[in-house]
Amino acid sequence: LHARLNWDGNVPSVIAGSHMDTVPGAGHLDGALGVVCALEALRVLKESGVALQRPLEAVSFSDEEGRFGGLFGSQSVAGLVTPEYLHAACDLDGISLTEAMAQQGLDAREALHAQRNPDSIHAYVELHIEQGPVLDRKGLSIGVVDAITGLFKWEIRLSGAANHAGTTPMDMRADAFQGLAEFAGQIDRVLAEYGSPHSTATIGRVELKPGAANVIPGEAVFSLDVRDTDSQTLEILADAFRRTLSAIARRRDLMFEFSVLSDIAPVQCDTSVVSAVDAAVNTLQLPATHLNSGAAHDAQIIAGIAPTGMIFVPSKEGRSHSAAEWTAWDDIEAGANTLIYTLRQLAA
């Protein structure tokens, strides 16, 4: 969804936006804050009568959080969606992206023609909650983002042999859960040996089959989410986790396979946009710091076609993807004003 101000299609736009979707059980600010503040920024600048040399746009991207893999809207705009992706994209219930869109009267194939001409975008700015504890703990209102993390997300399947829990000796088992447990216990070691201070790895979803209390799990299916702000570090970590899985599978008489759900490169924010955010912060005399984003955002996709930057506001106690997600109204006001001043400078 787009809103446009002073747009005639001839001059590259300055765009602000984010996404409206979020994860199950989440709060009300993730993504939505950036969309609402983008609309408010356009309203304020229009009503103030400020003379701008460039048009402004507000955008709301779809499926950033990833029912079908994540960042679908921004990847469509960036020209990264392929027919193969549309064919393969499914949610955890096996419902395909194509099917879900058809149920709403939409044609997923239209995403193949949604690419924005890079020459039509002067800059993109995204206001977002930090989703981490740094700003809140430091008592700061604004985070100026220097880099956005990259990530790879796998679905891993360890296959052994389901068997009776009481009659199968411990040394004669091919227990898929024991393989998963050993792998989980190796995460800290892998990060310490091959990662950086910015590296994270998370197992966020686990399914054991057949799932009975008196049956040895014959299959363990789980997710692995690994992040860092450096592409080479991510490649090294991917290799280290593959080797760790292979060694555990051999030792425990298991088979393993994995599929790549997401593979997103880290990006550095554009220095001209970062400078515009810095100037806005200085003008408003707001307490701020520079930091990296540990979460993926639409901004890192749009960075492939346009100069991009991000503005963070604090998350109370660092909580996000939770009903406890909260940002103080004073900080929201500071973020909205920083966005307004940033857009004004970029469009001047």
Q: Where in the sequence are the language-model features?
A:
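Acidic, glycine-rich active-site loops and adjacent beta-strand->loop/helix elements
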Residues: 20-23, 56-67, 131, 162, ...
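Midchain, well-structured core segments that form catalytic/ion-binding scaffolds
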Residues: 63-231
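A short beta-alpha structural unit
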Residues: 202-211, 223-229, 255-274, 300
